[in-house]
């Protein structure tokens, strides 16, 4: 199941990662569905906030799942896992280059996550911590991902 999810993300990479990884839901609700379900909440218009916005703090969850899968199953689908590793590296560098300049914004709007969210708060703890966790797991202590293994017996 996990590898099927990884393949799905790769297949939809352009939409889910785009310029600011990672989109919170895909596809976003269209105008009619948005009006009916949210009462035309301006924060949740299509491609924004919880309706297709990009939330950088989500990347560490996804990255950790890839790294943990590599630890658990080092010989499983090596080609796929190589592609997934390359994807999280690319996303990491994207965030490293953008987030400090964009004041660690909470979320990003638009089909590609190009714009800082219309009501986004800056210097968000979860944005900063999410990036630092991804950095820690990729660069500092990769084995620390094992702390997140819920199937491991202690």
What are these regions (language model features)?
Residues 97-144:
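CBM-like carbohydrate-recognition segments
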Residues 144-154:
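A short, highly charged, low-complexity intrinsically disordered segment
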Residues 1-98, 137-140, 152-153:
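Active-site core of glycosidic bond-cleaving carbohydrate-active enzymes
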